[in-house]
Amino acid sequence: MAETPEKRGLEIAREADRRDQGFGNSTVELEMILKNSQGQTSNRELRMLTLEVPEETAGDKALIIFDRPGDIRGTALLTYTRITEPDDQWLYLPALKRTKRISSRNKSGPFVGSEFAYEDLASQELAKYTYRFVGEELCDNVACYKMERFPIYEGSCYSRQMTWIDKEAYRLRKIVSYDRKGSLLKTLSFKDYRQYLGTYWRAHDLTMENDQTGKSTRLLAKSYQFRTALNEADFERGALGRLR
């Protein structure tokens, strides 16, 4: 019996997921460059901490902390990724000394004025989508598997996404997202991949382009650190107001 596009798509997604298992935790410093439709830019500096959760019923945890400029210093987003249920996300606003829970209906909103939605910042767990293999295609002159995936979790701002995963190391190269009406919404590109611990690949240059507004957000990563002293206590909601 011929392999179905759905089964082939799931196999590719599963292999990409398998290759990134076991990293434990990571930290990285990032520069965020916001560009408006007129080409004007503004910059921010932030840190991202990630804790791998090896349970089948829960996804990874992530903490994003802004360091510059001063007016958003200390602003933080804590994400507990779920598998098929809505992710848990909390935004800490230092000026108000208040932690705000991000509801499912607000996860499609822009994260602190960027082109990334809140849901873009959760880990991309395998079971969050159904998949369909489309074919093989070059992406930035790299041989890739082209796949379509459909979010099955509540509140997604996307009806579907086209993804390109390279054949060499199963790394995401591009995600093209469509809004709930089926119109082209955003394109996320992954570039400058570097390998850590001889196993784990991380893109150091990500650009999210809004195809409807002409705005974009670029993230430039410095060197990642893996298997640090991070633990569950660093990702507790109650710790948000004590961040440094």
Predicted region positions:
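Surface-exposed beta-loop interaction hotspot
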Residues: S123-T130, E136
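Short amphipathic beta-strand and strand-loop transition segments with alternating hydrophobic
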Residues: R47-P54, R132-L138, D192-R194
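Broad gene-expression machinery/nucleic-acid interaction feature
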Residues: T27-E29, N43-E45, K61, K128, ...
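N-terminal mature ectodomain segment of secretory-pathway/periplasmic proteins
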Residues: T4-A95
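Preference for bulky hydrophobic residues occupying beta-strand positions
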Residues: L30-M32, I64, Y131, R149, ...
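Gly/Pro-enriched, hydrophobic low-complexity segments
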Residues: L78-Y80, D88-Y92, R98-I102, K107-Q124, ...
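Short, cationic low-complexity segments
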Residues: R242-R244
